[in-house]
Amino acid sequence: MPMTQHDIKAVFFDVDGTLISHRKHAVPVSTIHAIARLRKQGILTFVATGRHPIELKKLLPESLEFDAYLCLNGMYCFNHREVISTKPIPQDDIKGLLKILDENPFPCTFITQDEMYMNYANDLVAEVQRDISSD
């Protein structure tokens, strides 16, 4: 049996190349209106992305509202009221990574709930940052 509009309960959106155009590096106005229409119909809308919430604040317009956000590839999920789920990397794994970085340094980003840190940046990191339009 084919799915009807009434069968749709939720819609999940990626950020890069879905909400944000790779060409214009912005969310089209038509997308903002379409998501608002979905929400008016009672359809839940979610962002599912590898990005950090800090980046979403910079990239998504304030007028674009979602019911919840699944960030960092599902490692940090929240809505407007609460954090729903977190999956931090175990401390032993972090210690192992720091040892590897001491022995063989390479650019690495460390992410907390509220901040992002990088041990150092090189030309490749700068190029990737430009490509994904994030600071």
Describe these PLM feature segments.
Residues 75-135:
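HAD-like small-molecule phosphatases
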Residues 23-27, 82-84:
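Short, solvent-exposed loop/turn segments at secondary-structure boundaries
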Residues 51-69:
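Substrate-recognition/cap helix-loop segment adjacent to the acidic, metal-dependent catalytic center
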Residues 29-42, 96, 100:
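Catalytic-core regions built around general acid/base machinery
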Residues 35-57, 108-113:
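Substrate-recognition element of Asp-dependent hydrolases with the DxDx(T/V) motif
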Residues 5-8, 42, 66, 105:
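A general structural motif
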Residues 27-30, 90-92:
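Charged helix-capping and loop-helix junction motifs
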Residues 4-24, 97:
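Asp-based phosphoryl-transfer active-site loop
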